[in-house]
Amino acid sequence: MNILSLGEKIKKLRKEKNMTLKELAGDRITAAQISHIERDKSHTSRELLEYLASQLDVSVDYLLETKEMQSKKLTDNLILQGEILIKCNDLEKAEDQLNEAIKICDEYKVLDNYATCNFLLADINFKKGKYSESVMGYEKALYYFIKNNDKDKLYKCYLNIGKIYMIEEFYKGAILQFEFSEGILNEIQVEDVDIYKDLYSKMAYCYIKLDNNEKSLDYINKMDE
């Protein structure tokens, strides 16, 4: 799917139908006016758009769809494909899809999807054992998730960074990330106790590794509450 301006769409459709400028213009406007529209040098009225849409056998909504709207739709689709490929463990193809989506998001400022792409690429790098790249991806995503107040994604970012720090035996850093995760869980009032238990077990483990048995016991007790 190419991302096209209004003029580019009209020109592409006209060429596909082998219509000349004069044929598309008909008795409604001049060929010169159509040429201006195709070069995005002229504004069009709703009435004229309805005429052009009928001549080109498309909807007015299609013609009115902006580059930003098209880029959102295209990156939504690439992200969905990427998520499916990750679930199928086809990580290389998933990475290709998401990198393509990131380029489009960056060019057209589709910030929500830009954050999601970075999050999913971080997941891929986590699975590959590329921990530094993974943390960088989660941190990029965090910036936008914080701006959008996306609590669910924030929780997952902090949790996964904490898991990576555990693997790397950076236990103080892991605890800090898990504390951020715990704060979000409390804020959104998650009812699934198993989510809390899983988090508390990780925190207890980190405190044991830091020889802080008292804090470790606190979190072990929390698991039984």
Protein language model features and the residues they cover:
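Amphipathic alpha-helical segments of tetratricopeptide repeats
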Residues: 99-106, 139-149, 179-189, 221-225
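Short alpha-helical DNA-recognition segment
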Residues: 18-37
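Residue signature of alpha-solenoid helical repeat architecture, marking inter-repeat boundaries
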Residues: 72-73, 112, 152, 194
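Residue register of alpha-helical TPR repeats
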Residues: 76, 116, 156, 194-198
